[in-house]
Amino acid sequence: MKASQYNSSLRKKVLIFAAALVLLIALVFELYPRSSQIIDLSTGSGLSRMLRYDDAQVYICGEIHRKVEYQKFRNVLFKYLVEKKGVRVLLMEHGYASGFIENETIQNRMTFSDAFDQFTISQEDYELFRWMSEFNRNRPDNDKISIVGADITDSIEMLCTFCKYLLKDCDFSAADRKTQMLLIGIQKCRLQQRFQNSLLPQLIEQMQTQPEQLEIVLGDKMIHLERALLGWQQELTCNELNDYQAELQFGGKAMAYREDALYANLRRIYQENPTAKYFGSFGAAHVQMTRYVGDGTVHWIDNCFVSRMAGEESFLDGKLTVIDGDVTHEIGNLDESDTNHIILYN
């Protein structure tokens, strides 16, 4: 009888232990972010569980360019990061000049009608920039969203717009006559070909040989011209390394050169403002931490700038959350469907 009671008691204890173990495992899986999360693009539901690192300072998201569903997701994600995580810097995958003009717009120093058509490619872009502009209105400078172009991919149209805008309201009278004539020519230039083939090369030469004359005119704005022209020259070098093909070749010298430039630019941006929180939106191939094959193509960049930012020697020291580029291949398949749910793999 005692043996029977003992066995019955032991079975109860085993069952209680097993039940407790199952409950514990269920809680772990429920509370810890899983390998896939469902994100509702219309409400942002699920975003908080996706972003598992509360102490992250830089969030980098992969994308498929010009996909409507991706852009909706990006907008929801960015607004969430601004409102809940304190992100205040948007890193864009284009050159310094483009980022500068975009930033002037959302700071409400430049009207949307002046330049927005040059860098807006969709309604979703327009809505995001309008939202940032309204968010910044009447806020102190240290709480405003800013935009920085981190890439080396400015168009000649945007660089011309940038130069004209930078020279607006400048006094040329203290510079020498050669500099005055060059800057007046840029201000009045209406032909893109003339700017690209004549005025821009002269401006680059002036920056290299007589930068002090430009600084007399630009003052504190000189740093913006230096960075925009450096990015343009890097873009020319990249095009040359790519044999002037329209698309960069995976595994080629041009791709490696661009990744080096992106990493260096992001390191400089971060080091100039090391306490800010950042969100970056870049092509999926730059962001992927694992190989992905879609449509028979390997979407992967060896030694991409994001993998270096996530590495042990990174200037970020572990303060990075990567939203893998794989997610946007999933979104890309939905851009003609009625659903606003995607599955995020992280």
Where do the language-model regions lie?
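N-terminal secretory signal peptides that target proteins for export/translocation
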Residues: 1-7
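Compositional signal for N-terminal targeting/processing segments
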Residues: 2, 13, 17, 26-346
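Membrane-interface helix-boundary signature
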Residues: 8-12
